[in-house]
C-alpha cells in the first residue's frame, strides 16, 4: 500500500496540468485491490478545500469526486464510513466538509456537542 497525498488526488481528478496529471494517472492506475492506495482524512479535507477554493467546483461535483474515491476498490480511505456520512451532509448544504468531519469525530469520541 502507498499513501496518496492531496497533490496526487488533485492532479488525478482535475487533469489541469498535462505532465502532473499523467504522473498522477500512472501512479493511480497501477493501484490494485492487493496493492491499494491509502487516502487519509487530512488529504480528503485538504482536497475538498483545494477543489472549492482553487478550482471553484460545486459541492455536487466535489461530493461526486469523493464518492468515487470511496467506491474505488483500489483505494483504502481512512474512516470511510465517517467520510461517507460527512460527504452526504456536505452535499446537502450547511457546514463545510471539514466542519462535518470535526463534528463526526466529536460524536465518535462521545462528545455531547461540537
Describe the residue ranges of each PLM region:
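Short, well-structured N-terminal submotif of metal-dependent ribonuclease cores
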Residues: 1-39, 54-61
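Hydrophobic helix-cap positions at the C-terminus of alpha-helices
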Residues: 30-31, 69, 89, 109
